[in-house]
Amino acid sequence: MDQQETLNLTISSVMRKDNEKVVHVRFERDQEGKKHFAEGIVPECSFEKIYGFTEEEVAQLKFYLKEHVQDIFKEAQKINDKEFWLK
């Protein structure tokens, strides 16, 4: 990824999946008129849907998630479920 490139990260509130607390994340960027995205889950730091990112870029995103799991959960705890889904 280019250092000058704008990459947006959107996070959900804390949710439950298989009786475990999780946060859904989405990285997005616009490149050449197309919306690239990678949707994943923390704390697994895995991605469910990816479009437009290379394998190397996805590896960088996974590394970012692993390094920031606690920060992501702290921010997600501030989000009200209704507020998230109404955006």
Please describe what each predicted stretch is.
Residues 51-87:
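Acidic, low-complexity intrinsically disordered segments
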Residues 1-13:
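Negatively charged, low-complexity tracts enriched in Asp/Glu with abundant Ser/Thr
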Residues 13-54:
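A short, structured beta-strand/loop element
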Residues 7-9, 32, 69-72:
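Short, surface-exposed, charge-dense and proline/glycine-enriched linear segments
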Residues 7, 21-23, 59, 68:
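A generic structural signal for short beta-strands and their flanking turns/coil linkers
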Residues 2-5, 34-38, 86-87:
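Structured catalytic/translocation cores of nucleotide/phosphate-coupled proteins
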